[in-house]
Amino acid sequence: MDNRPIGFLDSGVGGLTVVRELMRQLPHEEVIYIGDSARAPYGPRPAEQIRAYTWQLVNFLLTKDVKMIVIACNTATAVVWEEVKEKLDIPVLGVILPGASAAIKSTASGRIGVIGTPMTVSSDIYRQKIEALSPEMQVESLACPKFVPLVESNELHSSLTKKVVYETLQPLAGRVDTLVLGCTHYPLLRPIIQNRMGPDVKLIDSGAECVRDISVLLNYFEINRSREKQELNHQFYTTANAKSFSEIAESWLRLKVNVEHVSL
């Protein structure tokens, strides 16, 4: 048993999609979350900058004595997950490999689409992971640079967002039977994405898939939190406006959250 919290980091609010799934599957675990909304999106930034920012978030979580870190950001996972995993003595998970594995299991045609930030797509990491596991798969990747700013602005249901999503996803329409949401912000746009792609296209939420791996590692290292009834003290931090962050967090998680502003 280990009653310390699990640390989550993201470029902004996107990682909350992973936290929501964790709270559904592992409701007894405690969460500390840091979202770097002041510097979002990470996707267009150079790799060295993403690496530096991610390490700042990692080091912040380490000051909170977390027992595990989840890099709940595809861009940061693509750039620096391997490095962080090797340097820390606690488990560190990323969100890409779980999403790649789930896509392979889902597809019937072998035609998989991946949408993500410019950095995630240019890294080609999803195609590499998918083809390493199943070489016969055909992967089409598409950068969606406008999606994260829309989510960070809480423009989840506007006519502008629908227009942007429909136009951006045009190149993949009718070409794949499985679509990996290769950015943890994207599930917040899931209804619009599903409508654009059609009901027969299976959407893979890479962050939600990651929670299954979290559960496996908690069991493997015997660091599950005690299941005895006790009050959880979830903590949420943002580098941007705490009120804006809490509005999105409370809507998505369906619970009252206290959000603190931090400067890194």
Swiss-Prot record:
Q: What are the binding positions for substrate in this chain?
A: D10, S11, Y42, G43, N74, T75, T184, H185
Reaction catalysis annotation = L-glutamate = D-glutamate
In Gene Ontology terms, what is a biological process of this protein? regulation of cell shape
Q: Which GO terms describe its molecular function?
A: glutamate racemase activity
List the Pfam families hit by this protein, alphabetically: Asp_Glu_race
- Taking the record's annotation, the residue ranges forming a coiled coil are none
**Which sites are catalytic?**
C73 (proton donor/acceptor), C183 (proton donor/acceptor)
Q: Which UniProt keywords apply?
A: Cell shape, Cell wall biogenesis/degradation, Isomerase, Peptidoglycan synthesis
Indicate yes or no for the key word NAD: no
Q: Per its UniProt record, what InterPro entries does this chain match?
A: Asp/Glu/hydantoin_racemase (IPR015942), Asp/Glu_race (IPR001920), Asp/Glu_racemase_AS_1 (IPR018187), Asp/Glu_racemase_AS_2 (IPR033134), Glu_race (IPR004391)
Pathway noted in the entry: Cell wall biogenesis; peptidoglycan biosynthesis
E.C. numbers: 5.1.1.3
- What exactly does this protein do? Provides the (R)-glutamate required for cell wall biosynthesis.
Per the similarity annotation, which family is this?
Answer: Belongs to the aspartate/glutamate racemases family.
Task: Please identify the protein, giving its name as recorded.
Answer: Glutamate racemase
In its UniProt entry, the species of origin is given as Streptococcus sanguinis (strain SK36)
Q: Taxonomic lineage of this organism?
A: Bacteria, Bacillati, Bacillota, Bacilli, Lactobacillales
